[in-house]
């Protein structure tokens, strides 16, 4: 199915591109989210008339995303205290939902869990520093350091009476 993209989409195309996609992808994703229209002569003419409006909307989204990325980068790091073993392994794990919630509380705008890119695409399971990437918009990313600390100090077993 031939469509005209109304928004830039990673690994698919840029705004205004006339591309061929599978019909299910177009019907189930692109059309409902208003990211593309069917490529016809009429739609092509309408798109050419409204192209400057769409590009200005895209520019405003990009500026907003750059502002958000700067705010997250300025945050620098967040600290999480959790229970862990003597060896530094967490009782549980820190996932993208936990990190997104802390970032949202810190910066004042919503960061969704799907925007968080964890190292090795797995939850954080040990004490220490972990570098996390946040996908803000198409090619705009922010970096953040997550410090995980132990909340319980374990006593040495030899001191028990």
UniProtKB/Swiss-Prot annotation:
Classification via InterPro entries: Ribosomal_bL9, Ribosomal_bL9/RNase_H1_N, Ribosomal_bL9_bac/chp, Ribosomal_bL9_C, Ribosomal_bL9_C_sf, Ribosomal_bL9_N, Ribosomal_bL9_N_sf
Classification via PROSITE patterns: RIBOSOMAL_L9 (PS00651)
Any single Gene Ontology cellular-component annotation: ribonucleoprotein complex
Role, per record: Binds to the 23S rRNA.
Name listed for the protein in its UniProt record: Large ribosomal subunit protein bL9
Disulphide-bonded residues: none
Keywords: Ribonucleoprotein, Ribosomal protein, RNA-binding, rRNA-binding
Family label: Belongs to the bacterial ribosomal protein bL9 family.
One GO-annotated biological process of the protein: translation
UniProt keyword rRNA-binding present: yes
Molecular-function GO terms, alphabetical: rRNA binding; structural constituent of ribosome
Organism encoding this protein: Blochmanniella floridana
Stored Pfam families: Ribosomal_L9_C, Ribosomal_L9_N
Name of the gene: rplI
């Amino acid at each position: 199915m031939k469509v005209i993209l109304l928004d830039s989409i990673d690994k698919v195309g840029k705004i205004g591109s006339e591309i061929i996609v599978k019909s299910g992808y177009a019907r189930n994703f692109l059309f409902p989210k208003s990211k593309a229209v069917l490529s016809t002569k009429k739609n092509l003419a309408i798109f050419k008339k409204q192209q400057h409006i769409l590009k200005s909307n895209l520019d405003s989204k990009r500026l907003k995303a750059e502002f958000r990325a700067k705010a997250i980068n300025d945050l620098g790091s967040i600290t999480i205290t959790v229970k862990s073993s003597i060896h530094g392994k967490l009782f549980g794990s820190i996932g993208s939902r936990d990190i997104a919630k802390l970032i949202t509380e810190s910066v004042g705008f919503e960061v969704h869990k799907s925007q968080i890119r964890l190292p090795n695409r797995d939850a954080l399971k040990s004490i220490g520093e972990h570098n996390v990437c946040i996908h803000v918009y198409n090619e705009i990313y922010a970096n953040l350091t997550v410090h995980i600390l132990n909340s319980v100090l374990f006593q040495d077993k030899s001191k028990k009476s």
